[in-house]
């Protein structure tokens, strides 16, 4: 079904069954598969391929040669009808690739809202991306990676499969990330190592001084106290009673499976 207000270039191929929403613009030489839904106000600029069971929300901007919902690169994949779900107001730049999920990984690759995926970024099967993240040019996420909200991944960085990156993390360019990264941390290197709290980013997002102070103290407990993570958890729990932002650390540690960067 194609909404009457949608504008589709005659060179594009829209397979029967695709659902194209109000005021969608599809430029030249795009291909949209039969199980694709595209929400109101989204633009496919040109040469965009959207396949598989894929849902794209409203007001997204998708640039040339992006490939969304294509067959993933997991050798166990046998053509199951897994999904790709993309939220609203994302900017997906040239040559970005986003692969559909796998049955073993939950069946869905998911992108939230208001993200910027720069040129040549790759998001593999079953990744879960939050809101307002930035992946710089050539950043690559292996399968099952999770990014919290407001994560910045520097250009030419690679994140190992199953890694969890906490909210408000900033990863410097050219990093190789093979273990989980706690919230609010800045890290860089091969392999990535922590080098402080993302204070400037947190200030821009309205974190007040008491909250920043608490986050700094928790960072020092984790990385500078000489104690094990198990030993500092009770102290972090005490901070979380008065500073809700600190609870992100506790949620993160409960979910972490690969150990944290050191």
From Swiss-Prot:
Subcellular location(s) per record: Cytoplasm
Membrane-spanning residues: none
Keywords: Acyltransferase, Cytoplasm, Lipid A biosynthesis, Lipid biosynthesis, Lipid metabolism, Repeat, Transferase
Main location: cytoplasm
Class of the enzyme per the UniProt entry, highest EC level: transferase
Pathway as given in its UniProt record: Glycolipid biosynthesis; lipid IV(A) biosynthesis; lipid IV(A) from (3R)-3-hydroxytetradecanoyl-[acyl-carrier-protein] and UDP-N-acetyl-alpha-D-glucosamine: step 1/6
Matching InterPro entries: Acetyltransf_C, Acetyltransf_C_sf, Hexapep, Hexapep_transf_CS, Lipid_A_LpxA, Trimer_LpxA-like_sf
GO cellular component, one term: membrane
UniProt subunit comment: Homotrimer.
Name of the protein this chain belongs to: Acyl-[acyl-carrier-protein]--UDP-N-acetylglucosamine O-acyltransferase
Organism of origin: Histophilus somni (strain 129Pt) (Haemophilus somnus)
Taxonomic classification: Bacteria, Pseudomonadati, Pseudomonadota, Gammaproteobacteria, Pasteurellales
Name of one Pfam family that matches: Hexapep
């Amino acid at each position: 079904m194609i909404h009457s207000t949608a504008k589709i270039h005659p060179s594009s191929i829209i397979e029967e069954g695709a659902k194209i929403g109000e005021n969608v613009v599809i430029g030249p030489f795009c291909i949209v598969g039969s199980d694709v839904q595209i929400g109101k106000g989204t633009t496919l600029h040109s040469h965009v391929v959207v396949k598989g069971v894929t849902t794209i929300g409203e007001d997204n901007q998708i640039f040339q040669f992006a490939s969304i919902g294509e067959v993933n690169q997991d050798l166990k994949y046998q053509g199951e009808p897994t999904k790709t779900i993309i939220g609203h107001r994302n900017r997906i730049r040239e040559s970005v690739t986003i692969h559909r999920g796998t049955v073993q990984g939950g069946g869905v690759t998911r992108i939230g809202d208001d993200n910027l995926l720069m040129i040549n970024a790759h998001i593999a099967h079953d990744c879960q991306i939050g809101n307002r993240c930035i992946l710089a040019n050539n950043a690559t996420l292996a399968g099952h990676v999770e990014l919290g909200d407001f994560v910045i991944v520097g250009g030419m960085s690679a994140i190992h499969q199953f890694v969890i990156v906490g909210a408000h993390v900033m990863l410097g360019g050219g990093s190789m990330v093979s273990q989980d990264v706690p919230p609010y941390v800045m890290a860089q290197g091969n392999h990535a190592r922590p080098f402080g709290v993302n204070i400037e980013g947190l200030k821009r997002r309205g974190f007040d001084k008491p909250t920043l102070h608490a986050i700094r103290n928790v960072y020092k407990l984790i990385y500078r106290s000489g104690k094990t993570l198990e030993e500092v958890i009770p102290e972090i729990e005490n901070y979380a009673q008065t500073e809700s932002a600190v609870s992100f650390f506790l949620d993160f540690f409960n979910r972490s499976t690969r150990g944290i960067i050191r």
